[in-house]
Every structure is written in structure tokens, then in C-alpha cells.
Amino acid sequence: YIPSGSMENTLQINDRVAVNKLPFVSGKIGRGDVVVFRDPASWLPEADSSSKSTIKTKIKDGLVLVGVLPNPAKQYLVKRVIGVAGDRIVCCTDKKLTINGTAVDEPYIFKGNNPSEITFDITVDPGKIWVMGDHRGASADSRYHQDDINKGQVPLSRVTGRVFGVIWPFNSAKLVPSIPVLK
């Protein structure tokens, strides 16, 4: 379930996505992948645990139990992988993001957004990734959490899997391919 516009136009608010959780099928997480991950360091507010015990709540709990809906207590996010271990990511020279000194073409960025309004110069640590939303003006991603314990990076151990498609609403169903960040 996509609750915000942080990944527009790749993903829309209220889209339901299919996630490949099998590492031997999905392979290594790489630049350009759209991934689901558990909140690495309090990026999100605490989940509301005061739900009333209604039939709707019980149905939702059942769908969470069988894996159709995400567990709200686990606080999942969806972002695009921009950098992997060892990458030096710098923003922004001439309104371009660079990875390892190479300017990046980002066709997926929401129209009218710059790569970032926040400047940064980060080298991704081993076992971590740097993530950003496609709608940069509406995404509190790695850039906004550089002062947390992970320096805004997401440990690979927190990654649930790679998004491979939108499955609902049905008229919006589509594949979500990885888009190479570096050519």
C-alpha cells in the first residue's frame, strides 16, 4: 500500500504493489531498483495502536496475517535505490546528482523537481544503500536523515524486497522495472 506521493509518478497514492522477497530470484539489490524496507531509524512516526476492535479491523488483521497487507506496526517505506556500498553520491552541481563522479540521468523524477534541494556528499557504507523518492519535493528519504545512526543509509538487513509491479487498482496494474541510474 502506497500512503504518500513520495514515489510519484512511478507509484501513486493507494497503489498496492507486489514485492519479490526471494533473494535467489530477485538477485542483488542495485541502483535504480524500487525497494520496500522497514523503517531503519525512526523515519516514520509511531504506528497508531489504538484501533478499535471492529469487523473491518479484524478483516485487516487477517489480511496482514496471511501477507496480503503489510503489518502497520513494522512501518514500511518504498523508495528508489540511488547508491550502493562504496558509491560516492554528491548533489548537486549544475542541478545534477553525481555517483562516483558521473552525472546521473534520472528520467523517473517527478516533473518540475530538481534532483535535490538539499546538498550532500556521502559515501555509502558496506551493507547499506542510499534511497530517494522519485517525487523529490515530497519525499523525506535518505537526504533528510543524514544525522541518524545510519547517516541516512538503509541497512540491507532492513530491505524486504524489490517492487516488481503495481497490482491494484487493477486498471493501473503494471510492471515496475529497475531503471539504471548509471549508464
What kind of region is each of these model predictions?
Residues 1-7:
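Aromatic-capped interface at the extracytoplasmic side
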Residues 9, 13-183:
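Soluble "head" domains of membrane/secretory-pathway proteins
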